[in-house]
Amino acid sequence: MEKGINEISSVVKPNSIVVNKSTVPLGTAKKIQKALRRKDTHVVSNPEFLSEGNAIRDFLEPSRIVIGANSKEHSERVAELYSKVDAPILISSWESAELIKHTANAFLAMKLTFINEIATLCEITGANIKDVTNGIGYDPRIGIHYMQAGPGWGGSCFPKDSASLTQVARSFGFDFTLLEHTIELNQKHLDRTANKVKKMIPKDIEDKRVSAWGLTFKAGTDDLRYSPAVEVLKRLETEHFLITAFDPTVKGKLPELPLTEIANDPYACAEGSDLLAILTEWDDFKQLDMETVALSMRNPNLLDTRNVFEKHEMERIGFTYIGMGT
């Protein structure tokens, strides 16, 4: 960062504004302003809120615009750039703008963790997570977004920003116990998902074969960073399962999963396996002939961690089916 700041300082014209769009730790804008060593150049924090798979829509139709500055003049100059954008503009300090982005991602991670915990409770009590999330989602105080149970959460933002926020809190002498437990519970949920695979395959099978559909952390992206799908398969690799995986965006071996074979199509992936785990919610999977898939498997067990299919329909065509919270 220091090299970049020096380059900026050497080329910007007087009375320029340096706008930071990245997600950065609390206090970064103040550090950049000091490192620039120029009183005629000013830093503004303007974090982006683009989600992978929806970046164009989020850019053209933002839910809000956050502008953090240390003076009204500079925040208003940046706000003028968005004068034709139909979205609320929130003016704040540097610190608030930086904290807003981290807080948003950490809150969504916490929301997913809560729903995954409720999904586990549903499995124990006989309730159905789909009914529960529908029932609470109509409450406008809660909403319907980020309410889908799954194998765990990951991606390029949630793990990083949640960890960063706990570190910032710790640096100020505050133990952010709620968020620390959120991160810990997500790891336990990933363990729980891997354990479901182990329980579904008969113990007397020596060469336990698992097929996995989906490797990216969510549909609509090729991003594998901290993917819950990859994290679950890592756990199975350590248990010596024979794993074959398919993802429409992945071609060839993955260094993250050295023991996992990558199939060219979903049917070949499932053939001869003892369990099929759906780990990413690609829409393409809904179009496949699942009866053909079931017939091709050695043991037609289906672990649907994204609740892509309906249990009664999968059982009708011959699967032993387990979803998340169903």
Located regions from the model:
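Structural/interface elements that position substrates and couple domains in central-metabolism enzymes
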Residues: 1-326
